[in-house]
Amino acid sequence: MNEKTDDIILAFESSADETSAAVVKNGNTILSNVVATQIASHQRFGGIVPEVASRHHLEWINRVTEEALTKAGINDPERQLSAVAATYGPGLVGSLLVGLMAGKTFAMVHHLPFIAVNHLAGHISAANFVKATVYPALAIMVSGGHTELLWMEKENTFQIIGTTLDDAAGEAFDKVGRILGLKYPAGKEIQEMAGHGKAVIKFPIAHTEDDFDFSFSGLKSSVLNYVHHHEQVSEEFNRNDVAASFQKAVVEAITEKSRLAIEKFQPKELLLGGGVAANLALRTAFENLSKEYKIELTEAPIKLSGDNAAMIGAAAYLNYKQRLFAPLDLNVDPSLNFARM
């Protein structure tokens, strides 16, 4: 590898239950992306246990780092790397600390600039592995912890125009999965069940005071009431139909709010990212929305929809171009978010 002919960044991600390190070139090419998942450790609890997650991160952070560097052919970091990046929020405080400390330590030891990355910017920046974004753009970020509409007037700028008032879409999937007796995380299994069912149950879509905000707690409660009612009166019901109807309600809620935002802000491109962006029904709905409004749509690749360090490297590159470096005494920010428009 030639000496810094490209901008190459080593990135870390550990905000929740994935321990990941990646090496990314010029913000759009993955040289390596290693992810160690903890799903099996959290399944019996029905969700992420912060203490368990932190312990796993500590066990895996050095291993994923070594593997990422080896796969990318990095044997002289100070010469071959341009910077080091890590997620510093939002997320679980103990989990965030592991990746942030790994990144800051690596940067200090190898005399490299350090870049702090907003996890949400990472999810949106995963689209850069597909193509360069045309601005202004409307980003739809749908994950386990966040559901947001973000206005991007230009590169590396994010303003919230809509957010969830309670449960995030991914959280609603997991809670409904629990109601249906599914293992955590439930998103993929609900999608599979929905494919075998019919969306014949009319679950409500919340109408919020702000045109662009979301609410999924009422939908979750409606599913719970439907299932409990049928169980209490010993009346059979089709679980696949429940899954299909719930999924349809979530997809409609997200696309309808996005439709309103498209009509008001007139973006040149739509970006879809986050773990729930792997849902095929949601992707199809946005592909149809894109065609309807004749706006280009870029979806994060399914394999990069979940938490991973490659997306952090893509977001870090945008900061690197602007020389937005962070001090090595930076701390984590578990509740980090963008400013509201």
From Swiss-Prot:
Superkingdom, natural source: Bacteria
EC numbers: 2.3.1.234
GO biological process terms, semicolon-separated: tRNA threonylcarbamoyladenosine modification
GO cellular component: cytoplasm
Main location: cytoplasm
Catalytic activity entry: L-threonylcarbamoyladenylate + adenosine(37) in tRNA = N(6)-L-threonylcarbamoyladenosine(37) in tRNA + AMP + H(+)
Binding-site list for substrate: 141-145, 174, 187, 279
Pfam families: TsaD
Cofactors demanded by this protein: Fe(2+)
UniProt-listed InterPro entries: ATPase_NBD, Gcp-like_dom, KAE1/TsaD, Peptidase_M22_CS, TsaD
Subcellular location(s) of the protein: Cytoplasm
EC category: transferase
Binding note for cofactor: Binds 1 Fe(2+) ion per subunit.
Residues the entry annotates as binding Fe cation: 119, 123, 307
Gene3D superfamilies assigned to the protein according to its UniProt record, in alphabetical order: 3.30.420.40
Family: Belongs to the KAE1 / TsaD family.
Function text: Required for the formation of a threonylcarbamoyl group on adenosine at position 37 (t(6)A37) in tRNAs that read codons beginning with adenine. Is involved in the transfer of the threonylcarbamoyl moiety of threonylcarbamoyl-AMP (TC-AMP) to the N6 group of A37, together with TsaE and TsaB. TsaD likely plays a direct catalytic role in this reaction.
Name recorded for this polypeptide: tRNA N6-adenosine threonylcarbamoyltransferase
Gene name linked to the record: tsaD
